[in-house]
């Protein structure tokens, strides 16, 4: 037995009377988010046991809360069906929800380390609550939970609230940027991070599958819209970014045939090929269309055996990378040349791998890489003395 993380004892008298003893277990049970987990509080009337797991007292996002409620307003022989319709039960439930959320807000404000421990164990429940508000509770649930969320960022490997993120935003920043990945290292290495890092813009790190789904429901925080660094344009409004954008448009116009032929070569693997204004040192990246699902969402749906939701893939190429100049040169041989097709395939495969996705035919890609390496070796390996002789 471990001491509970939090204990709340309340005795309420008035129009409705009840005593509650609630607690958060020290650790989340292994099956908290599985279908076999049974949430609910014990229900008593005048110290007489009525029900073991009453699910109707607390919302689903507080399923981790344990404890009991004792109220004289319940009949001892009330059926489960009548209990679900009970006005008293609903009033008690609303009061309990307020009590718990108030306690969490106070802990966040007065004992940050304790709240972070709570977040580590049960934060996912609150995020699932926001995502589930689409079907139950709507904006009311979002407003209750949004200030309790914590995330790490590109600048700080520590948890911060959305309010703290917004307070630290430069005045010129109009959006809350976020990135998804399995861990910090995988996000740090994303090509899309380069320009934001250079400009000192902080990025929220979403490391849990449910994070982006919850944010999609929220849409914005304090008037600042959320924006994935891997979806659509970054919409950076500073002078330097606008100049780069104009330069990129000029390069794209002078390379229209090349871009068109790359798209033709890749076919329906990509929806669009673009000259990138966001890449700094990387040759290529994949971004998703702003209106559709992200790559992380696509993967989450696939993991849930629902592969119907696909991100609209846009291949972005860095015009200042050496590979772009090489691609232009190879394109002069014609779009049907083997070299041009190989370069297009390898650039797309590289973009997939950066996003943590596998090419459709890894073996074919490996063979193309081996062929290019062999050609490179022939070009740069000096003849042996025997060859000279």
What positions do the PLM features span?
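Conserved small/polar residues in nucleotide/adenosyl-binding loops
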Residues: 380-387
């Amino acid at each position: 037995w471990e001491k509970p993380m939090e204990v709340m004892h309340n005795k309420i008298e008035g129009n409705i009377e009840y005593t509650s003893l609630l607690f958060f277990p020290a650790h989340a049970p292994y099956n908290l988010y599985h279908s076999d987990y049974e949430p609910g509080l014990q229900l008593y009337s005048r110290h007489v046991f009525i029900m073991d797991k009453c699910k109707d007292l607390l919302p689903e996002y507080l399923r981790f809360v344990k404890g009991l409620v004792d109220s004289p307003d319940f009949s001892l022989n009330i059926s489960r069906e009548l209990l679900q319709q009970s006005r008293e039960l609903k009033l008690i439930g609303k009061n309990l929800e307020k009590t718990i959320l108030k306690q969490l807000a106070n802990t966040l404000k007065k004992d940050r380390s304790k709240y972070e421990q709570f977040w580590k164990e049960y934060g996912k429940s609150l995020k699932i609550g926001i995502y589930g508000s689409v079907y139950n509770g709507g904006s009311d649930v979002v407003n209750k939970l949004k200030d309790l969320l914590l995330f790490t960022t590109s600048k700080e490997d520590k948890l911060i609230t959305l309010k703290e993120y917004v307070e630290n935003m430069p005045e010129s920043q109009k959006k809350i940027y976020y990135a998804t990945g399995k861990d910090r290292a995988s996000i740090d290495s994303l090509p899309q991070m380069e320009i934001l890092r250079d400009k000192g813009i902080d990025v929220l790190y979403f490391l849990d599958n449910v994070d982006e789904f919850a944010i999609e429901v929220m849409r914005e925080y304090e008037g600042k819209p959320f924006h994935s660094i891997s979806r659509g344009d970054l919409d950076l409004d500073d002078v330097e970014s606008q100049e780069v954008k104009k330069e990129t448009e000029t390069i794209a116009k002078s390379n229209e045939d090349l871009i068109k032929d790359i798209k033709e070569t890749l076919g329906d693997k990509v929806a669009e090929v673009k000259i990138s204004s966001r890449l700094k040192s990387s040759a290529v990246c994949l971004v998703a269309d702003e209106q559709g699902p992200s790559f992380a969402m696509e993967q989450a749906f696939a993991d849930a055996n629902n592969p119907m939701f696909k991100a609209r893939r846009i291949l972005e190429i860095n015009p200042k990378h050496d590979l772009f100049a090489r691609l232009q040169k190879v394109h002069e041989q014609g779009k049907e040349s083997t070299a041009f097709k190989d370069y297009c395939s390898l650039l797309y495969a590289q973009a997939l791998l950066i996003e943590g996705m596998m090419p459709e035919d890894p073996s074919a890609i490996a063979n193309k890489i081996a062929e290019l390496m062999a050609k490179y070796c022939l070009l740069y390996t000096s003849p042996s003395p025997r060859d000279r002789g």
